[in-house]
A protein has these predicted regions:
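Surface-exposed, charged secondary-structure patches
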Residues: 1-4, 108-153
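Short beta-strand edge/turn micro-motifs at domain boundaries
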Residues: 2-66, 129-131, 164-206
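Residue-identity detector for glutamine
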Residues: 12-13, 97-98, 143, 156, ...
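Core segments of small alpha/beta cavity-forming domains
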Residues: 36-109
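Generic structural motif
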Residues: 70-71, 137-143, 183-185
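A short linear-motif detector with a strong N-terminal bias
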Residues: 101-102, 109-113, 157-160
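Mixed-charge, low-complexity intrinsically disordered segments
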Residues: 146-169
């Protein structure tokens, strides 16, 4: 089988420190990376609050999270390209609705998000846009809704939380590393998801 390419972002805190991997993101099969400056020159890293882009890195992450939770009802829906975005199919609104419908009547589920701890990285592209890596946490909370009821975590959530049953509820946090192409400010082009990596980072009782 063909191994999908991975985009690595390595960060060096100072000239004497070792490089450390900040992001390791699997690219989408259809991803086309925009051109950046040659390695001999180096791509410029843009400030997190740069006004040169259609959306700042943090705003891009927040907007995409809103799409994963609301789909076409999100105010940001038309700002992002849907073609080739397999993460929406995996964890988007339809997947969340399927989780909700699979629960018994004695339990409820809520979905939320927050920015992750990793600092965003934006590298300028030759067309005045940027390749942007961001860290987003998606949070799933399952709670019993009736007295005496309980919830039963499964799979990785069960293994990481160490719980087989809970009368209080379970909260699981999934860390998303997302890679986008963000066009220049004023551009009519859409933001494109170039790749992503997702993993369960925390799980426990409420």
């Amino acid at each position: 089988d063909t191994i999908p390419p991975v985009a690595l972002f390595l960060v060096q805190q100072d000239p004497r420190s070792d490089y450390k991997v900040s992001y390791a993101i699997t690219l989408e099969p259809s991803a086309v990376l925009p051109e950046v400056a040659p390695a001999s020159v180096g791509a410029a890293r843009l400030a997190p609050d740069s006004g040169l882009l259609k959306s700042t890195p943090d705003d891009t992450a927040e907007a995409y999270a809103d799409i994963l939770e609301k789909d076409v009802e999100s105010d940001a829906y038309l700002d992002f390209d849907t073609e080739g975005d397999s993460l929406r199919a995996a964890v988007g609104l339809a997947a969340k609705q399927q989780i909700r419908s699979s629960l018994p009547a004695t339990a409820s589920v809520a979905f939320s998000h927050e920015l992750g701890a990793a600092a965003p990285i934006a590298l300028a592209t030759n067309d005045a846009g940027a390749i942007v890596a961001v860290n987003l946490n998606e949070i799933t909370t399952v709670q019993p809704v009736e007295a005496g009821a309980a919830v039963n975590p499964t799979g990785q959530v069960k293994a990481l939380s160490g719980l087989a049953i809970s009368t209080k509820g379970i909260r699981a946090t999934y860390g998303d590393q997302l890679l986008f192409y963000v066009p220049a400010a004023g551009s009519d082009a859409k933001i494109v998801l170039l790749g992503y990596s997702v993993g369960l980072v925390k799980a426990g009782e409420i």
